[in-house]
Amino acid sequence: MNDQPWMDSEWMQKMRTKRADAAVTIRTRKFLTNRLLQRKQMVVDVIHPGLANVSKDELRSKIGKMYKADKEVVSVFGFKTHFGGGKTTGFALIYDNVEALKNFEPKHRLVRIGLAEAPKGGRKQRKEKKNREKKFRGVRKSKKPRKE
């Protein structure tokens, strides 16, 4: 139960639904077709007055719909919200196909959109494994160090 009764009022409920239905405008500028990397690239301005930031997943689907492309080939990144809120600017890339996306996008962005798997284990574990394997120079490397 809330300590503030006005939070559960009818007016507050109406405001919540009004904010959820508020329009989000997406504008693109600096549009460029990059044939070498098999993509279209652009700067995206998202205008969302009175709302929190729009999720990247939602932006991917809306930009895909704007350019008649599948959501899977759209990559969005680098979004910064302007002071005071209401406007966010970032970048979008629309690839010709999923293979081009997998070839040219950085691995961390592929992990974020679910097209690649994050590396297992931490940085320290990888370094320790590398150094263990270096100890046996000149002999066949195995997972377990040899007992002498």
Swiss-Prot record:
Pfam families: Ribosomal_S24e (PF01282). GO terms for molecular function: structural constituent of ribosome. InterPro entries: eRP_eS24_sf (IPR053709), Ribosomal_eS24 (IPR001976), Ribosomal_eS24_CS (IPR018098), Ribosomal_uL23/eL15/eS24_sf (IPR012678). Residues 121-148 have a biased composition (Basic residues). One of its GO terms (cellular component) is ribosome. Keywords: Ribonucleoprotein, Ribosomal protein. Gene3D superfamilies: 3.30.70.3370. It comes from the Eukaryota. One of its GO terms (biological process) is translation. Residues 115-148 are annotated as: Disordered. Belongs to the eukaryotic ribosomal protein eS24 family. This is Small ribosomal subunit protein eS24. It comes from Mucor circinelloides f. lusitanicus (Mucor racemosus var. lusitanicus). The lineage of its organism: Eukaryota, Fungi, Fungi incertae sedis, Mucoromycota, Mucoromycotina.
